[in-house]
Amino acid sequence: MASLALRGSSENPAPTKDTTTNPRGIPYAPFVDRVEDYVTSTTDVESTLKSFSEMISKYQFMESNTQRRSAGLKDKIPEIQKTLAMVRFLAGREEDDEPLETHFELNDTLYAKALVPTTKEVYLWLGANVMLAYPVDEAEELLVGKLGAAKTSLENCDEDLDFLREQITTLEVATARVYNWDVGQRRKEREGKGGKS
């Protein structure tokens, strides 16, 4: 894929060695300005079209994975924000000696009443069935870091999705140009043979 991505046009100059990929390593699709740069005869058309089709499939696979990752982050960010808000609430109650009365969810429609004493540590689920105790201030610091990383990752996913859609469109246009060039060449060949008879 990278060998085809090194070509360019006056509108889209050939990427330099440093810009053949986006910041996360996804390669640029080749921009076909002149079909003759890719295809020299009608015998090359099939292999070129197959190559473009394979690249489109790869970009679509990357797009699908990025969409899944983005959806996961969109679910995860509100959970982190909710947990962070609770940790900050508990941090604000450190000086209060009275226990907090609360209701917590046992099931979708079943809640239990509890008295939560003032605490200096919280337990956080880290994933993969791992829970660790943290002092409240360290838990807040950890959650702020995780929230920032998740938001950055979501922004990167959104950028990558836009980039991938652009590359898929570029390849679809390239495929159409090569196909149309082939049709034109075959028509010229038929007209040339028909004129000689």
Curated annotation (Swiss-Prot):
GO BP annotations, alphabetical order: microtubule-based process; protein folding; tubulin complex assembly
Stretches the record annotates as Disordered: 1-26
Keyword line: Chaperone
Source domain of life: Eukaryota
Cellular component, GO annotation: cytoplasm; prefoldin complex
GO molecular function, one term: tubulin binding
Compositionally biased region (Polar residues): 9-23
InterPro entries according to UniProt: PFD3, Prefoldin, Prefoldin_subunit_alpha
Record's note on what induces expression: Expression is positively regulated by the cluster-specific transcription factor TSF1. Expression is induced by the presence of the cluster-specific polyketide synthase PKS1. Expression is up-regulated in the presence of large amounts of glucose, during nitrogen starvation or at alkaline pH, conditions highly conducive to elsinochrome accumulation.
Signal peptide residue numbers: none
Record-annotated disulphide pairs: none
Key word Zinc present: no
Task performed by this protein: Prefoldin subunit; part of the gene cluster that mediates the biosynthesis of elsinochromes, pigments consisting of at least four interconvertible tautomers (A, B, C and D) that have a core phenolic quinone to which various side chains are attached and which play an important role in fungal pathogenesis. The non-reducing polyketide synthase PKS1 was proposed to iteratively catalyze decarboxylation between acetyl-CoA and malonyl-CoA subunits for polyketide chain elongation.
Family the entry assigns: Belongs to the prefoldin subunit alpha family.
The protein's name in its UniProt record: Prefoldin subunit 3
